[in-house]
C-alpha cells in the first residue's frame, strides 16, 4: 500500500508540474525566434535573451528557441549572452499592437581561439550537455559522458549512483544500499580502472585495485567520462573500460556556488536507528599503543562502543561550496570546491548460509536476520590552479582529498536450522551485535603541463603523487547465545549466555607515484595533417596492510564452570586468549608494483576518414611479502610479465554530425594485490577470503563498431556492438580449505567471450525530453566445476567421490539486460527541471561456486527515482530528490528446485525452482535543498 501511494504521489507531482508549464494561456503579442552558432548554425541551448532596460529576459529551450509573450506596446532592444560566445548585436523592434508577432534569429560568434596546443580563452560551457555531446562526437575513442548539469538535476549525489544512468553500466551496491562499484558492459569491476583528470588513482581497499565510487561526491565533478575503448596512448588495463572523473575548472569570470540540503530515509519511519558511542572506539590496538611485548587484558578494551541503543535517526546534512575566478587577463585560474554529506542509511537483511549436500543440492545451516544502521559522512576538498603563460605554454596544479566514514551498528539474529532443531520456531539462536567504523580516503596531487616546442610539435606531461587507504579500528561483534528449551511441550529459549568474540584492528595505506610524458608531431604530408605521438608512463606503487585480532573469552562462572549469563556490556568480564594479538595471522602483507609503459601512435585524416593506430607495451612487476613462515609455500613472491597491446580505431564521417566507428585493440587485467597473497582473512560477512599466488593476469582482444548521430547539440542516437575474447579471466569462487572452511578465492577460469550491443537515444520536444539506453550482453565462460558422484539408489557416493564437469556459464557480474529510461521536463522561463528516472538491471551471477549449478544469482532489479528543481530569481534554486521510490529489494538465490514443504523454512517458496539465499531492503531516501549561484 505504501509503495503504491509513493508511486501515485510522484506521478501526480510530475504531471502537475508539467501541466503548469504546458497549459499556458495563449498571448496575443509575441517576440520569438532562435539562437544559433554563427559558424556551425547549431542551436544554442540555455542562452540568455535580454530585453534591454527592462526586467524581461528568458533562456532558449532544448531546440534553441525563445519566446516573449504579451509585451506592452512600445520600442524595445534585445540582445543575447552566453558563456563562450560574444554578446550579440542589439536587435531593435516595436510592439505596435496587441496582436503583432515579431520573429528574429540571433547569430552568436564564439570567443574560442584554439591553437594546436593551448585553448587561450573562451569555450563552450564544459559543464553543459552540449559540451558532453560535442566531446563524444569528436573523441578519438568510444566514450559516453555525463555532464555536471545532468548530474545536478539527477536524483543522485554520489558518483557511484550517477554511473547507473550511463549506457552499459550497472552497479554493485554496498550493504547500506548505495551504489559502490561500476560494472561496464557486464565486465566485473576488476576489469575497469578509475582516473581523475586523466591520471589513474589508487584504491583505498585493503585487497583490491578497483576504486569504490561512493567515496566521491558528485557535486565537485565537471563531467564523468566512461571510455568504452582505449587507444595506444591510454593505459591498457581496460578490458571493460575506464572511468575518468574530470574535476571542476575555473571559468572565465567570478563564480560562487553554494548548496545546502537535508533529507531523511524512509527506512527509519518503521525502524529505530541503532547506535553506540563511536567516540569510544580506540584507533590503535593494545599492541600498537604499548609495543610488541605488551600483554593485553580485558580492561584494555572499551565497552561503550558495544552499548547499543535505539534512537531516532537525525536528518541529513548536505553542504557544498565552490568559488573560482580568473586573474591577470584571464591567465591565472583558481578554483576551490568542497563538499560535505552526512546521511543515515538503514537496511534489513535475511541470509541463509548454505552448504552442498551429498546429492548436489543446497542445504541450509542457519537463517540470519540482520538490522543495520549506518551513519555515512562523505567529505571532499578540491583545489585547482592553472596558469596560461602564452599561446604555447600552460601549467596546472590540482589536489583532491576525499573521505568516507561509515559508522555501522548491526544486530543479527542467527538461528540454527540443524542442531537441536525440531521444527518451525525452534533452534539455537546466536545474537551478534556489531560495531564497525570504517574510514576510506583518497588524496591526489597532480602537476600537469602543455608546451609547444616547435610550430608543429608539442608535448604534454603529468607528475602525480597519490595516497589511499582504509582504517577499521576496533571492529567488534558481541556474541551471545540462547539455546532451546521446552516449557510444557512449547518451544522456548534459555537465558542468553556470553560467548567468545574478537576485537579487530585493520588498516592499510597505498602510496603511488605516476609520471606521464607524451610528445606529438603534426606535420602536413601531401596536404593532409598527420599526428605522430610517442610517450611513456612509469608508476611505482607500494601497499602496506596491517591486521591484528584479539580473542576475548568470558570469564567462566559457577560450578561446573560455564559461560556466564549476559546482563549488560558493563557487567561482562573477559580474559584475552591471545594477549599479544594475532599479528601473524590474517591479511598482513606488503605489496609493490611497478609499471613501465611506452607507446607509438599515429593519427591520419583522409577526407572523411580518421585513422588512429599504434602499439603499446606494458611491463609489469608485482611482488609481495607476508607474515607467513618460510615453511608455507609462496609466503613471498613476485611475478613479471610484458604485454604488447596493438590497437586501431577508425572513424568515418558519413555526413555532418554522423560517425561510423570501428575499433580493435588488445587489453589486460592485472590480479588484485591480495589475489597473489596466500593468506586467509576470517569471515566478517558471509565468507572469508584466501589469496592464490598462482593466478594469472587476463588478456583480451576487443572489437567494437558504433554508429553515432547528433541531430542537435544535446541530442544523440547511438547503435553499437562489441565482442571481447578473454584468456584467463579472473573470478572469485567459493572453495573449501583443508580445514573445511568455505572461503572466496580468485581463480582463472579457462577462456571466455563477452559480446553484446548498445542502443542510446536522447531526444527533446521543446520543453519535454526523453533519454533512453539499452545494453544487451551475452557472455560464455568455459569452466571446470565439480560435483559429488552421488548414487540415488544407495544414497551414498560412488568412486571416485568427486567428478569434474566441463560446463559454461555467464561471466560473474554480467547482466544480460540493462536499461535506462528518463523523462524530462524543462521550462527555462519558469526555471523548472523535472526528471523521472528508471533503471533496470537484469539478473546476474554475484558469487561463483565450485559445484556445478550452485552459483549465487542476483535477481533482476528495477529502481525508480525522481528529482525536481525550481529556479527562484536569477541566483537561487530549490530542489527535491527521491531515490528508490519502489523500495526495490535485492534478492540472491540459487537456481535449484526447492524440495521442502511450505513452512519448513521461513521466506522460502515451496515448489519453487530456486532457494532464497539473501534478501536486502533499504527504503526510500528523500532529499531537499537550496542552491545559490553567483
Model-derived regions, located:
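Transmembrane beta-barrel wall of Gram-negative outer-membrane proteins
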Residues: 30, 304-410, 443, 646-648
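A beta-strand signature from Gram-negative outer-membrane beta-barrel systems
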Residues: 215-259
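C-terminal beta-signal and adjacent terminal beta-strands/loops
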Residues: 840-847, 870-934
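Short acidic/polar hinge/loop motifs at secondary-structure boundaries
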Residues: 171, 199-228, 248, 273-274
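Gram-negative outer-membrane beta-barrel transporters
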Residues: 723-725, 743-844
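Outer-membrane beta-barrel signature, preferentially recognizing the C-terminal barrel domain
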Residues: 424-448, 583-596, 668-726, 737-764, ...
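Extracytoplasmic beta-strand/coil segments of soluble accessory domains associated
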Residues: 160-200, 223, 241-242
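Short, acidic, small-residue-rich periplasmic hinge/interaction motif at the N-terminus
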Residues: 36, 48-50, 81-83, 101-152, ...
